[in-house]
UniProtKB/Swiss-Prot annotation:
Residues involved in ATP binding: 40-41, 82, 85-87, 148-150, 191, 201, 238
Organism of derivation: Desulforapulum autotrophicum (strain ATCC 43914 / DSM 3382 / VKM B-1955 / HRM2) (Desulfobacterium autotrophicum)
EC top class, as a word: hydrolase
Family: Belongs to the RuvB family.
This protein's encoding gene: ruvB
Highest classification ranks of the organism: Bacteria, Pseudomonadati, Thermodesulfobacteriota, Desulfobacteria, Desulfobacterales
Segments of skewed composition (Basic and acidic residues): 11-20
Name this polypeptide is given: Holliday junction branch migration complex subunit RuvB
Length: 354
């Protein structure tokens, strides 16, 4: 396998994979695929919390495919980072009984990288491409016949001597994940039979996830601690699990080991996370709009330049949650800070000065 590719298996076969979700090729391992994080992932839809409509849609589609003895339609998942797109791909593989191969758009630099993976897939296997919007155009074009006809076309020689050969693939399921669905070309997007957008989780859903993760990590926490942690997790399970570990460490060193609401507040204060889950970068983003650009409107490139941050970081990581809770507004003229942003930062709104 080429760099950037991981293989997992949910069945026994003769290709070297083992049962369960054991890591086979660790090269270029994604940051959220450490052994502890993987252990916190639910492996069936029955234990998956949140995204009710998406889960129901996939359960129906999977059951129908099994009844027909057919493969599942290709799936495209859209949403901010950390909402469960990779986890859902693992669950789809488990539910369908296929082997999961994980890669990402930037890792597939040449058409040969993709073709090598496609030709190694068995019937019913799942290929998960994270950040699919970052696929090079030349690689993306190989996906069109692969998704539609389960075939890839090879061209030999050039000019008058050019010859084309079609290689038949086994039927597979492509699961694509993206944070920027608008950057996916229409020909690729239209080839997905199932398209679902994932939304931020409610505090109640996050409390359930935190309690499950705490049990797996042998962490004792009370109701107030679970709710406080949920409120500061930006509606994102990945962040909730990460903060739970930081709070666990803090409680082990600075208190009796039991996680309380007070220890959550103290631990996350050290992390620079406030009562609404805003990080230092979030607050600097809002302060930049308010103090440097008088509340906006201002273009995202100008904000990124002032903060010395990548524009994609602000668009993909910072803005989704701030938009969700109404701290910032996107207008045709640019970004504008809301009254709520002024109040949260303790800054007097400009309109009140006159």
């Amino acid at each position: 396998m080429s760099d950037g590719i991981l293989s997992f298996s949910s069945k026994n076969d003769k290709r070297g994979e083992t049962s369960g979700k054991e890591l086979i090729t660790p090269s270029s391992q994604p940051v959220d695929d450490s052994s502890e994080v993987v252990s916190l992932r639910p492996d069936r839809f029955e234990s998956y919390v949140g995204q009710t409509d998406t889960v129901e849609t996939l359960k129906i589609a999977i059951q129908a495919a099994k009844m027909r003895g057919d493969c599942l339609d290709h799936v495209l998942l859209h949403g901010p980072p950390g909402l469960g797109k990779t986890t859902i791909s693992h669950i789809i593989a488990n539910e369908m009984g296929g082997t999961l191969t994980v890669t990402s758009g930037p890792a597939l630099e040449k058409g040969g990288d993709l073709i090598g993976m496609l030709t190694n897939l068995a019937r019913g296997d799942i290929l998960f491409i994270d950040e699919i919007h970052r696929l090079p155009k030349t690689v993306e074009e190989f996906l069109y016949p692969a998704m539609e006809d389960f075939a890839v076309d090879f061209v030999f020689d050039k000019g008058l001597h050019a010859r084309s050969h079609r290689y038949r693939l086994k039927q597979f399921v492509l699961v694509g994940a993206t944070t920027r669905v608008g950057l996916i070309s229409s020909p690729l997007r239209d080839r997905f039979g199932i398209f679902r957008s994932l939304d931020f989780y409610t505090d109640e859903e996050l409390v359930t996830i935190i309690r499950r993760s705490a049990g797996l990590l042998n962490v004792v926490l009370d109701d107030g601690a679970a709710l406080e942690l949920a409120r500061r997790s930006r509606g994102t399970p990945r962040i909730a699990n990460r903060l739970l570990k930081r709070v666990r460490d803090f409680s082990m060193v600075r208190s009796s080991g039991e996680v309380t609401q007070k220890s959550v507040a103290a631990a996350l204060s050290l992390e620079g996370i406030d009562s609404k889950g805003l990080t230092v970068l979030d607050r600097n983003y809002l302060r930049t709009i308010i103090e440097f650009y008088r509340g906006g409107p201002v273009g995202i490139e100008a904000v990124a330049a002032t903060l010395q941050e990548e524009t994609d970081t602000l668009v993909d990581v910072v803005e989704p949650y701030l938009l969700k809770i109404g701290m910032v507004m996107r207008t045709s003229a640019g970004r504008r800070a809301s009254v709520g942003a002024y109040e949260h930062l303790g800054i007097k709104h400009q309109m009140e000065l006159f």
